[in-house]
Amino acid sequence: MTVYFIGAGPGDPDLITVKGQRLIRQCPVILYAGSLVPQALLEGHQAGQVVNTAELDLEQIVELLAQAHRRGLDVARVHSGDPSLYGAIGEQIRHLRELGIPYEIVPGVTATAACAALLGCELTLPEVSQTLILTRYAARTKMPEGESLGDLARHRATLAIHLGVAHLAKIVEELLPHYGADCPVAVIHRASWPDQEQVRGTLGDILPKVAARNFRRTALILVGEVLAAEGFADSSLYRAEHRHLYRPGE
């Protein structure tokens, strides 16, 4: 018996991995985060028990996993995006270890990747930014020392900010001294879902643009020069003079 923490991807059912889809269709027990996982992902399952965990607390979820273990039944524990990023699987894994229950993490497509695809851009451009920082706004969960937005902004790297659209004004206030008012920003709401929306602007004008769209949750904020960069240098990867194992020199 194994508990599979499966990344369902950002919303589009076609973006789940082949392995994740196969496990959902094979496992006799499915626990899924119904608030963020589309029902279409569960199509074709043969499970005898399917539970939406949106209204359950940690203790109740762990008990369901333990019950499945006692019955010798594999569990598809389906999370949105990639479960290793803000998936709250750490505390579940801790309980599984204490109970001696095997588990496996099946990666998923991240919201950041889906947003970059929607925007049609690369997040790491030569001589513009080679660093992408995934972070969140500090609301109920406090940030460790040195990880405030102000601290991270000093690097001027590309930022992907989760769980922050409701606090956008404070985010802009913290970033402005480091990035400047002209720094490009994109706010993507429900990336890859049928009703996905995007708003593009700068730190200087993004607030009224987002307010007009009334985004409340399930939005990602991307910040950085890569979002509007033009005339950047080509990478060395495909340069004719660049030699490597598959393109050796003569």
Swiss-Prot record:
Q: Which UniProt keywords apply?
A: Cobalamin biosynthesis, Methyltransferase, S-adenosyl-L-methionine, Transferase
Copy the pathway line from the protein's UniProt record: Cofactor biosynthesis; adenosylcobalamin biosynthesis; cob(II)yrinate a,c-diamide from precorrin-2 (aerobic route): step 4/10
Keyword field contains Methyltransferase = yes
Q: Name one GO biological process term.
A: cobalamin biosynthetic process
**What GO MF annotations does this protein's record show?**
precorrin-4 C11-methyltransferase activity
The reaction(s) catalysed by this protein are: precorrin-4 + S-adenosyl-L-methionine = precorrin-5 + S-adenosyl-L-homocysteine
Disulfide-bonded cysteines: none
Cite the PROSITE patterns for this sequence: SUMT_1 (PS00839)
Q: Which EC number(s) does the record attach to this protein?
A: 2.1.1.133
Q: Which family does it belong to?
A: Belongs to the precorrin methyltransferase family.
Which NCBIfam families does the record match to this protein? cobM_cbiF
- Per its record, how is this protein called by name? Precorrin-4 C(11)-methyltransferase
User: What's the gene?
Assistant: cobM
